[in-house]
């Protein structure tokens, strides 16, 4: 099994490049109030050289259709990641993959596609209850997020056996400040963990 790795909340080209070099499978750009927030134009600029085999993910929280259309037009994402209920009010082309976010403590429907499982709040480093995540029936579609870092990602993968892992604050030296060394350590730890499964 190959563990899918997403590095989220990228704001600078050097960190985008570090994530690509480290072997990340997806890169997330946040279009919501956060220390990691970027504009669609900024995201388009720093992601211009991402290879086509790496997914560009637009991360949004309760967006209006107008704000989503701006992101769609300027950034051209491969994936939209948003809370599950947000998708109903958005006009999303079939070419864009949808990753609904389901939060710990809420109901997880039996979804057949990729989804993100995380804590009550995004990007705050709060560790999800891995034990409860491990018993979700469709965790082979789960991208596990919430409180992951280079030191605990292997343990999380071993316990939950998700499709993938997603990190933001766990590879930062401060709020919104990505650390190249931590990005590389996280991807290495996640990719090494798959060998023990």
Predicted regions: what they are:
Residues 1-117, 122-197:
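Conserved N-terminal beta1-alpha1 strand-loop-helix module at the mouth
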